[in-house]
């Protein structure tokens, strides 16, 4: 993991959307125009720069050749290890299997990449939070832009620790969390040197105490401020979405319901309907997006981006090796007219292949196409087949409805859960009728649609 000056040297006037995209040191600038560690921590400009750097990491962090950049690529790779993905053909990503990932070592495997990514976020949030609390003056801390950035920093730290605990520790269990080994705990109380020294492994309970404290601080801070309408910033509704995920993981059903409802009510987003969901997931102004990122027009996105790696229509990308299909055990339960069927190509369903699909998918092998014919993923598309241009997704409104529905069902609120599930699925399948299932059967139905809706968005692996 590289130090602050390698990741977050902020040139004067640099904004979030003017940062290069395909290099790990994407915020490094010349020494004559950059801010050092102390300057970054001790000034308003530095705090804003650190938080902008965190956002840049979310879409531009370089995981290495062929992996794809940023959190969306890591989310997709995690879902490759879930039970909803099928592979029967040679594919460049075949090494990312559940058992294989447990045995891999080195700095070019998913274990290291996930650890490094989330802890790099944490290290820099610690520096930002420490500077806000201990270095800025009271008047500086009252500045609305500074308060907003501080709120985002707290939310980022909670998000990153929650991801780490799910990946590298036991799932939260209220009866054992106080003794279950969690992850290494680093906070803003450490000095810069201490942030990179060996530290003890905390418990799962300690991790979630910090996560929930950070989320509370972030929500209290952001709720009282004018919301940044850009979806490449964390807003009050986005933090409520993170809190809903955390509560669901902890089996705190009442809190999960509350936070999901709060996210929905304040998101300034709405569910996409029918063909709107076939937009290729490449435009962060899409109605349903809550959190995503847009590259600047001047940025050379090249071959390292998420869409260059995983879209189905970018010429000369890596995607013709992305031969992974949806599990037909769940896909075949979709309604005949469910628009989500078009996110997957099933050779036996007599579907039309999209006209602009990359030629690498098309060579025939024994009379069949060269992709994963059981249900090839075609969910992601670039805006123009000759360019890797396109926005990247972190959180959608639909997820909040599924969290709310599950939380309601877990509390025995079957009628409410049925209505919530109907509300979201009806936008995907015009023929969908109000569910009548109750109890475990209703929960299974909620999971079915959540699994299909959010596959490759980094949700299913954690739900397993």
Q: What are the functions of these language-model segments?
A:
Residues 37-41, 65-87, 168-183, 224-307, ...:
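Short, surface-exposed recognition loops and adjoining beta-strand edges that mediate ligand/DNA contacts
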């Amino acid at each position: 993991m590289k130090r602050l000056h390698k990741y977050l040297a902020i040139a004067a006037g640099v904004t979030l959307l003017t940062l290069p995209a395909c290099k790990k040191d994407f915020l490094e600038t010349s020494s004559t125009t950059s801010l050092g560690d102390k300057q970054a921590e001790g000034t308003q400009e530095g705090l804003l720069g650190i938080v902008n750097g965190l956002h840049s990491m979310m879409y531009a962090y370089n995981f290495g050749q062929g992996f794809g950049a940023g959190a969306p690529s890591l989310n997709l790779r995690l879902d490759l290890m879930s039970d909803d993905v099928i592979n029967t053909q040679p594919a460049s990503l075949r090494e990312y299997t559940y058992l294989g990932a447990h045995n891999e070592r080195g700095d070019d495997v998913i274990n290291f990449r996930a650890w490094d990514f989330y802890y790099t976020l944490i290290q820099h949030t610690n520096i930002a939070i420490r500077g806000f609390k201990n270095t800025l003056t009271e008047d500086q801390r009252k500045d609305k832009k500074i308060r907003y950035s501080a709120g985002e920093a707290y939310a980022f730290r909670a998000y990153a620790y929650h991801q780490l605990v799910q990946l590298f520790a036991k799932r939260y269990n209220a009866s054992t969390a106080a003794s279950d080994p969690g992850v290494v705990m680093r906070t803003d109380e450490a000095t810069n040197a201490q942030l990179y020294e060996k530290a003890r492994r905390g418990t799962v309970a300690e991790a979630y105490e910090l996560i929930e404290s950070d989320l509370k601080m972030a929500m209290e801070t952001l709720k009282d401020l004018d919301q940044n309408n850009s979806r490449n910033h964390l807003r009050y509704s986005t933090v409520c979405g993170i809190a809903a995920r955390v509560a669901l993981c902890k089996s705190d059903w009442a809190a999960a319901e509350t936070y999901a409802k709060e996210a929905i009510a304040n998101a300034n987003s709405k569910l996409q309907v029918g063909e709107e969901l076939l937009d290729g997931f490449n435009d962060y102004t899409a109605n349903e997006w809550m959190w995503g990122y847009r590259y600047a027009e001047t940025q050379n996105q090249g071959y390292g981006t998420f869409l260059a790696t995983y879209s189905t229509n970018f010429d000369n990308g890596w995607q013709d090796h992305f031969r992974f299909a949806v599990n037909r055990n769940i896909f075949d339960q979709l309604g005949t007219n469910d628009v989500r069927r078009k996110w997957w190509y099933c050779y036996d369903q007599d579907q039309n292949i999209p006209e602009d699909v990359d030629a690498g998918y098309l060579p025939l092998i024994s009379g069949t196409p060269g992709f994963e014919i059981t249900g090839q993923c075609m969910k992601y598309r670039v805006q123009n087949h000759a360019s890797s241009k396109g926005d990247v997704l972190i959180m959608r409104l639909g997820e909040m409805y599924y969290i709310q529905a599950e939380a309601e069902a877990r509390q025995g609120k079957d009628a409410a859960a049925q209505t919530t599930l109907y509300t979201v699925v009806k936008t995907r399948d015009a023929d969908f009728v109000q569910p009548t299932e109750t109890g475990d059967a209703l929960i299974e139905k909620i999971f079915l649609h959540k699994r299909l809706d959010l596959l490759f968005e980094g949700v299913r692996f954690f739900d397993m």
